[in-house]
């Protein structure tokens, strides 16, 4: 029997973050770049779900959380029994401990 593919699920805050990133990118750089960047982020979610150890531990911020960078954003996530739970997508200028 083939191995079941892991999945990712976005927390409500992460879904709002992704929408905000898309809207900001649309306003600043246009629709093509907005699609390209959010596609890059969602591809990273899929990759992390199937290989969560690619993300680095950030227990010093919040126990059990891991982080991976895409462009100017950090994906904060937890490993789950189904893959990963994406908690937040934070710009590198944001204070992660305050927003997590």
Language model features with spans:
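Short proline/glycine- and basic residue-enriched helix-capping loop/turn segments at helix->loop/beta transitions
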Residues: 46-50
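Enriched for short, Lys/Arg-rich terminal
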Residues: 73-100
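Short, hydrophobic secondary-structure boundary micro-motifs
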Residues: 34, 56-58, 98
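Basic/aromatic recognition patch in beta-strand/loop cores that engages polyanionic ligands
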Residues: 53-82
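Arg/Lys-rich, positively charged N-terminal/basic patches that mediate binding to nucleic acids
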Residues: 1-36
């Amino acid at each position: 029997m083939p191995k079941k593919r892991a999945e990712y699920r976005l927390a409500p805050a992460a879904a709002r973050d992704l929408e905000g990133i898309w809207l900001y990118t649309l306003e600043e750089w246009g629709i093509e770049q907005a699609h390209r960047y959010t596609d890059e982020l969602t591809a990273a979610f899929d990759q992390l779900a199937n290989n969560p150890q690619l993300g680095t531990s950030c227990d010093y911020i919040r126990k059990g959380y891991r982080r991976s960078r895409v462009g100017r954003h950090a994906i904060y996530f937890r490993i789950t029994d189904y893959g990963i739970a994406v908690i937040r997508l934070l710009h590198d200028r944001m204070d992660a401990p305050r927003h997590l």
